[in-house]
Curated annotation (Swiss-Prot):
Belongs to the RNA polymerase beta chain family. The lineage of its organism: Bacteria, Thermotogati, Deinococcota, Deinococci, Thermales. It comes from the Bacteria. This is DNA-directed RNA polymerase subunit beta. It comes from Thermus thermophilus (strain ATCC 27634 / DSM 579 / HB8). NCBIfam families: PRK00405.1, rpoB. One of its GO terms (cellular component) is DNA-directed RNA polymerase complex. It is an enzyme of class 2 (transferase). DNA-dependent RNA polymerase catalyzes the transcription of DNA into RNA using the four ribonucleoside triphosphates as substrates.
C-alpha cells in the first residue's frame, strides 16, 4: 500500500533511543563492561569508594583496616525466560576484591568476597524480579543546592535554604528575624548564625569588610559576646544549643558539627547540588560539603556567600532573584541507576557496621576479608528496593506502547518525593520550562494529575539529572545544523524560534519572527534569533506524538487519547492506522516488540517458532519467536514471521511482527468505516453502534491468557497431593486430566471444570463409635481425604495452552516454606467484540458498544458499501476534538485511493491538501458507480435539495457536481439499511482508527446468589474477586423509603443482607418451593445492642406486649 508523506519540516536529528533514560542510567551505575581501572567514580563504584576503607573503632587494638580494590559482576545463573518461569530474579553475582591491613604489623590479606546479587536490566529497560517484569520509574525532585524564597509571613523578607541530597544531611534555613538577628534553623532548632560564623573562624572585622555594603542588615550579626569568644568556645556553646542534653566536651562538639556540615560521608550536596550552588552564588567549592575541617579548625565554603546573596536580595540589589522551585532548572530526575545506588549505599553502610563489630570481636590473626564481610544486609537492601519500593512497578505491557511509556514515566511521588495530599496546584501545573522536556499533555486524570508525567520525545537526562532538549544554532539569521542540548537554566539566556519558522534554504525567510525568551512570546528580527527548535515533535511525549492532527484537539481530550492508546488490547488482525504521524515504526523498534535482522544476509528457515538467517560471513543465526506469551496484564504477546525462505534481508530489516504491529508499524486498533450520525438513540451519550460484519471478519478479536495456580503443601494433617484420584467425582469430570491430575494442553474448559486435581486430608472431628471400630480394624486407612482441586472460576474459561509444574528440589526452583510443588495452568480465551466493550479513538473520543446490528441494517453508501461503526455527532462540538473529523476526511480519501498517510503533528496535512485528495477519491468513487451503470439516484437528488436549503451545496449545479461538493466536505448520501431509503441529510463518512481498550465487559460481568459473608457484620462481601454482592447503601435505602416500598426495603436489610436465620430459612423455602418466611433480627442490630451494652447502657428488647425477648438465644449453634 502506498504511503504518502505530508510535512515540510526537515528532520535534523533522529529521535534519541526511546528507552535510553533507563538503559544508559543503569549501565552507568553498574559499569559492568568497563575495566576496573577505567571506571568513573559514579554508581556503585562511588558507593564503594565512599564506604571504604572501614577502620576499627577501638583504636587501642593497633587497628585493622578493610579496604576496597575493585568489583566485578559474574554471569547470571539463569536465562531470562527461565527466571520468568521459575519465579526467579534475573540477576548477577557481585564480587569485590578486598584487602585487610593490620596497621601495627603491616600484614595485608587480600581476598575476593561474594557480596550478593544485583538484578540486571533486560535489553528493553525492565527487570525480572521474582519472575515478574518490573519497571523502575524515574523520580523528579527538587535539586539539591542553595535556594532563596520569599518569607510567606513577612513581605520583603527572604529565606535562604541549603538543601542536600535526600537523607544525606539536614536542611538548613537562614533568615533575618524581625529583631534584626540573622538566625539559622537546623534539625528544628534555631540559633544565631553568628555563632556558627565564629566557629568557622570569622571575626568582626572580616564580616564588616565582606558585608559592609549592607549596613543595618550586618548589625544583626554583630554580637559582641560571641566575638569575645575563641572559635573553640563558640563551638561548645553551639553544641550545647543543638544538643542540650549532652555533656559539653570539645571532641564531642567537633564530631557533631563535623557530621552536620563537613563530613563527606554524612553530608552530601551531590554533583548537581554543587553545580547549582556554584552557579547561584558565583563561587567554586572544593567538595560537596558546606565546610572543611583542616588542622583542627573548620573552614567555611558556603555560609558567607549565601549570607551575602541573602542580604543583597533583601536590599534589592539588581541581578539577585528569588528562585522558582517549579522551574526545571531547579528540579532534577533521579533515574534507575541513582535510585538503585542509593539503596546500595544504605546496604553497604549496614555491611560496614557488621564489619566493625566483627573486627572488635574476632582475634586479629584469624580474621580474613571473607570472615569479616556478611553480604546479607546488602542483598536485603537491594531486594527491598526492587520488590517493594513505590517506584518499582509491575510493568504495564498491555501493548508495546504501554511498556515503552512506562519506562519514560516521571513521578514526583515515592521516597524523598511528594505525597498526593501535600502536592498543591503549582507543582502539578505545566511550567514554561516543560517545553521540550516534559510533555504538557500526558498525565493521569485522577489524584496523580501533574505528579506523574512523561518525558518529551527528544528530551535527554544529563549526568547531573537535569533534562535537556535539543536546539539548532542560528547565526545571523542562518540556521546551522549544529544541535545543542540545553537545560532549562541555559535556555533562559537565549531567544529561540519555533521549528515551523519559514526558511528559504537555511535562511529565515520572514522579516519578523515569532520567538520566545524565558518562555514569553516575542516578535524579533531574524538576526536576534539565537536558536531554533529542532522539530514540532519535541514538545510532546511519544504517546501524544501518535495523535494525528493533534493541533486541532483540545488538550483535555488529547490527554485522554494519549492515555487510552496505552490501554489498547493487541488484536489478532492488527492494522496500522491509515492516518499515521511518523512515529509508529520507531515505537515498535524501540519497544523490542518485533524482531529485526542484525546483519545483511538471507533467510534460511522459517517456521512458527523460529527464523534462521544465514549472514554474509556464513554464520547461521536463529531467532526464536515468542508465541502466545502471557503479558503482565493477561494480553497475548505473539510474534509472527514476516519473511520467507530465500528472502534477502539488510541490517535492520523486519523479520517478525510483534503484538500490535503490522509490517513494523504500531497497530493498536483497526481502520473502520465510520458514519457520524445519530441512530435511533442507540448511540446516545457516547454509546457506539457497530456492524456484525466486524465480528465476522474478526476485526476486534483479541486473545487473553489467564494464569491459574495451585500449591500442594505439607499440612498438620498430612501432605496435600496433586492427583487424578479425587473422591466422589465421575469419570466425565476427570476426562481432561492426565494420569497425574493436571489438565491436558488443548482442553476446552468451562466454569467449574477441574484444572488441577488435589486432595487434602479432612480435619479431625470426634469419630463416632462405628468409625473408631473401623479404625481399630483397618488402621489409618479409613481417614478420608477431601477434594480441594483448582477449578475454573465463574465466568471464565477457554483453551488450555500451557502447564508448568515446579517441584521442590528441581534446579533453580525456590518454593515458599511448607510448599511441596506448584502447578500453573495457562488458559487462553478468544474474545470477540461484544456489547459493553469499550472502544476509543486517538482523540479522546471513547464509548461503549451499545448495539451490534446485522450488516443489512447498517447505513450504506449508494454503491451498497455498509459502514462499520456509527458514532454520535454530539460527542464532537462540546469536546472540541476536531482532529478526529480531519482524520475521518483523510481516511475517506485513503479508503478509495488505497493509500496511507503520514501526517506529523503541527506539520501535517492542511485543508487544501485533504480537499485535493478527496477530489481524486471522488473520481474513483463516482467513476466506479458510473462503470457499474448507475449515476445519480433520484432519491439522492431529494437529499441534495435539502442540502441546498442548508447552504451545503451551490444551487444550480448538476447533481454530480453537488455530490462532489459534499464529498470535498467529507460528506456522502447514506441509505438506511433497514428501510432502503436515503437518510435525510448528508453524513460525514470516512475511515477512523478505533481501538478496543482493556476494559472489557467480560472481566466485569458478575452475579451472585449466595456466597461468602463477612465474619464480623455477617453481610455479603463486595467485589467480583470475593464473589461478593452489590452494596445497597444509605442513599439506595432513601430511594426505597421515598417510594414507600416497605417489603422490598425490609428484604434488602434482612434476608439479602445479615439476617442469618432468615436467609437460611429463605434458601430452604426457595428450594422446597414454599413461601419465603418472615425475616428475623439482622446481625447488625445485635451488634448495635452489644455496643450499647458495652457502654454500660441497659438495653432490653421487648415484644408488642412489653415482654422481654432474647435476641441472642441459641445463636452459637446457628452460626
Amino acid at each position: 500500500m502506498e504511503i504518502k508523506r505530508f510535512g515540510r519540516i526537515r528532520e535534523v536529528i533522529p529521535l534519541p533511543p526511546l528507552t535510553e533514560i533507563q538503559v544508559e542510567s543503569y549501565r552507568r551505575a553498574l559499569q559492568a563492561d568497563v575495566p576496573p581501572e577505567k571506571r568513573e567514580n559514579v554508581g556503585i563504584q562511588a558507593a564503594f569508594r565512599e564506604t571504604f576503607p572501614i577502620e576499627e573503632e577501638d583504636k587501642g587494638k593497633g587497628g585493622l583496616v578493610l579496604d576496597f580494590l575493585e568489583y566485578r559482576l559474574g554471569e547470571p545463573p539463569f536465562p531470562q525466560d527461565e527466571c520468568r518461569e521459575k519465579d526467579l530474579t534475573y540477576q548477577a553475582p557481585l564480587y569485590a576484591r578486598l584487602q585487610l591491613i593490620h596497621k601495627d604489623t603491616g600484614l595485608i590479606k587480600e581476598d575476593e568476597v561474594f557480596l550478593g546479587h544485583i538484578p540486571l536490566m533486560t535489553e528493553d529497560g525492565s527487570f525480572i524480579i521474582n519472575g515478574a517484569d518490573r519497571v523502575i520509574v524515574s523520580q523528579i525532585h527538587r535539586s539539591p543546592g542553595v535556594y532563596f524564597t520569599p518569607d510567606p509571613a513577612r513581605p520583603g523578607r527572604y529565606i535562604a535554604s541549603i538543601i542536600p541530597l535526600p537523607k544525606r544531611g539536614p536542611w538548613i534555613d537562614l533568615e533575618v528575624e524581625p529583631n534584626g538577628v540573622v538566625s539559622m534553623k537546623v534539625n528544628k532548632r534555631k540559633f544565631p548564625l553568628v555563632l556558627l560564623l565564629r566557629v568557622l573562624g570569622y571575626d568582626q572585622e572580616t564580616l564588616a569588610r565582606e558585608l559592609g555594603a549592607y549596613g543595618e542588615l550586618v548589625q544583626g550579626l554583630m554580637d559582641e559576646s560571641v566575638f569575645a569568644m575563641r572559635p573553640e568556645e563558640a563551638l561548645i556553646r553551639l553544641f550545647t544549643l543543638l544538643r542540650p542534653g549532652d555533656p559539653p566536651k570539645r571532641d564531642k562538639a567537633v564530631a557533631y558539627v563535623y557530621g552536620l556540615i563537613a563530613d563527606p560521608r554524612r553530608y552530601d550536596l551531590g554533583e548537581a547540588g554543587r553545580y547549582k550552588a556554584e552557579e547561584k552564588l558565583g563561587i567554586r567549592l572544593s567538595g560537596r560539603t558546606l565546610a572543611r575541617f583542616e588542622d583542627g579548625e573548620f573552614k567555611d565554603e558556603v555560609f558567607l556567600p549565601t549570607l551575602r546573596y541573602l542580604f543583597a536580595l533583601t536590599a534589592g540589589v539588581p541581578g539577585h532573584e528569588v528562585d522558582d522551585i517549579d522551574h526545571l532548572g531547579n528540579r532534577r530526575i533521579r533515574t534507575v541507576g541513582e535510585l538503585m545506588t542509593d539503596q546500595f549505599r544504605v546496604g553497604l553502610a549496614r555491611l560496614a557496621r557488621g564489619v566493625r563489630e566483627r573486627m572488635l570481636m574476632g582475634s586479629e590473626d584469624s580474621l580474613t576479608p571473607a570472615k569479616l564481610v556478611n553480604s546479607r544486609p546488602l542483598e536485603a537492601a537491594i531486594r527491598e528496593f526492587f520488590s517493594r519500593s513505590q517506584l518499582s512497578q509491575f510493568k504495564d505491557e498491555t501493548n508495546p506502547l504501554s511498556s515503552l511509556r512506562h519506562k519514560r514515566r516521571i513521578s514526583a511521588l515515592g521516597p524523598g518525593g511528594l505525597t498526593r495530599e501535600r502536592a498543591g496546584f503549582d507543582v502539578r501545573d505545566v511550567h514554561r520550562t516543560h517545553y521540550g522536556r516534559i510533555c504538557p499533555v500526558e498525565t493521569p486524570e485522577g489524584a496523580n494529575i501533574g505528579l506523574i508525567t512523561s518525558l518529551a520525545a527528544y528530551a535527554r537526562v544529563d549526568e547531573l539529572g537535569f533534562i535537556r532538549t535539543p536546539y539548532r544554532r542560528v547565526v545571523g539569521g542562518v540556521v546551522t545544523d549544529e544541535v545543542v542540548y540545553m537545560t532549562a537554566t541555559e535556555e533562559d539566556r537565549y531567544t529561540i524560534a519555533q521549528a515551523n519558522t519559514p526558511l528559504e534554504g537555511n535562511r529565515i525567510a520572514a522579516e519578523r519572527v515569532v520567538a520566545r525568551r524565558k518562555g514569553e512570546p516575542v516578535i524579533v528580527s531574524p538576526e536576534e534569533v539565537e536558536f531554533m527548535d529542532v522539530s514540532p515533535k519535541q514538545v510532546f511525549s511519544v504517546n501524544t506524538n501518535l495523535i494525528p492532527f493533534l493541533e486541532h484537539d483540545d488538550a483535555n481530550r488529547a490527554l485522554m487519547g494519549s492515555n487510552m492508546q496505552t490501554q489498547a488490547v493487541p488484536l489478532i488482525r492488527a492494522q496500522a492506522p491509515v492516518v499515521m504521524t511518523g512515529l509508529e515504526e520507531r515505537v515498535v523498534r524501540d519497544s523490542l516488540a518485533a524482531l529485526y535482522a542484525e546483519e545483511d544476509g538471507e533467510v534460511a528457515k522459517v517456521d512458527g517458532n523460529r527464523i534462521v538467517v544465514r549472514y554474509e560471513d556464513g554464520r547461521l543465526v536463529e531467532y526464536p519467536l515468542r508465541r502466545f506469551y502471557r503479558s503482565n496484564q493477561g494480553t497475548a504477546l505473539d510474534q509472527r514471521p514476516r519473511v520467507v525462505v530465500g528472502q534477502r534481508v539488510r541490517k535492520g530489516d523486519l523479520l517478525a511482527d510483534g503484538p500490535a504491529s503490522e509490517n513494523g508499524f504500531l497497530a493498536l486498533g483497526q481502520n473502520v468505516l465510520v458514519a457520524i450520525m445519530p441512530f435511533d438513540g442507540y448511540n446516545f451519550e457516547d454509546a457506539i453502534v457497530i456492524s456484525e460484519e466486524l465480528l465476522k471478519r474478526d476485526f476486534y478479536t483479541s486473545i487473553h491468557i489467564e494464569r491459574y495456580e495451585i500449591e500442594a503443601r505439607d499440612t498438620k494433617l498430612g501432605p496435600e497431593r496433586i492427583t487424578r484420584d479425587i473422591p466422589h467425582l465421575s469419570e466425565a469430570a476427570l476426562r481432561d486430566l492426565d494420569e497425574e491430575g493436571v489438565v491436558r494442553i488443548g482442553a476446552e474448559v468451562k466454569p467449574g471444570d477441574i484444572l488441577v486435581g488435589r486432595t487434602s486430608f479432612k480435619g479431625e472431628s470426634e469419630p463416632t463409635p462405628e468409625e473408631r471400630l473401623l479404625r481399630s480394624i483397618f488402621g489409618e486407612k479409613a481417614r478420608d481425604v477431601k477434594d480441594t482441586s483448582l477449578r475454573v472460576p465463574p465466568g471464565e474459561g477457554g483453551i488450555v495452552v500451557r502447564t508448568v509444574r515446579l517441584r521442590r528440589g528441581d534446579p533453580g526452583v525456590e518454593l515458599k516454606p511448607g510448599v511441596r510443588e506448584v502447578v500453573r495452568v495457562y488458559v487462553a480465551q478468544k474474545r470477540k467484540l461484544q456489547v459493553g466493550d469499550k472502544l476509543a479513538n486517538r482523540h479522546g473520543n471513547k464509548g461503549v458498544v451499545a448495539k451490534i446490528l446485522p450488516v443489512e441494517d447498517m447505513p450504506h453508501l449508494p454503491d451498497g458499501t455498509p459502514v462499520d461503526v456509527i458514532l454520535n455527532p454530539l460527542g464532537v462540538p462540546s469536546r472540541m476534538n476536531l482532529g478526529q473529523i480531519l482524520e475521518t476526511h483523510l481516511g475517506l480519501a485513503g479508503y478509495f485511493l488505497g493509500q496511507r498517510y503520514i501526517s506529523p503533528i503541527f506539520d501535517g496535512a492542511k485543508e487544501p491538501e485533504i480537499k485535493e485528495l478527496l477530489a481524486q477519491a471522488f473520481e474513483v468513487y463516482f467513476g466506479k458507480r458510473k462503470g457499474e451503470g448507475f449515476g445519480v439516484d433520484k432519491r439522492e437528488v431529494e437529499v441534495l435539495r435539502r442540502a441546498e436549503k442548508l447552504g451545503l451545496v451551490t444551487p444550480g449545479k448538476t447533481p454530480e457536481e453537488q455530490l462532489k461538493e459534499l464529498f470535498l466536505q467529507g460528506k456522502v448520501v447514506l441509505y438506511d439499511g433497514r428501510t432502503g431509503e436515503p437518510i435525510e441529510g448528508p453524513i460525514v463518512v470516512g475511515q477512523m482508527f478505533i481501538m478496543k481498550l482493556y476494559h472489557m465487559v467480560e472481566d466485569k460481568m458478575h452475579a451472585r446468589s449466595t456466597g461468602p459473608y463477612s465474619l464480623i457484620t455477617q453481610q455479603p462481601l463486595g467485589g467480583k474477586a470475593q464473589f461478593g454482592g452489590q452494596r445497597f447503601g444509605e442513599m439506595e435505602v432513601w430511594a426505597l423509603e421515598a417510594y414507600g416500598a416497605a417489603h422490598t426495603l425490609q428484604e434488602m436489610l434482612t434476608l439479602k443482607s445479615d439476617d442469618i436465620e432468615g436467609r437460611n430459612a429463605a434458601y430452604e423455602a426457595i428450594i422446597k418451593g414454599e413461601d419465603v418466611p418472615e425475616p428475623s433480627v439482622p446481625e447488625s442490630f445485635r451488634v448495635l445492642v452489644k455496643e450499647l451494652q458495652a457502654l454500660a447502657l441497659d438495653v432490653q428488647t421487648l415484644d408488642e406486649k412489653d415482654n422481654p425477648v432474647d435476641i441472642f438465644e441459641g445463636l452459637a449453634s446457628k452460626r
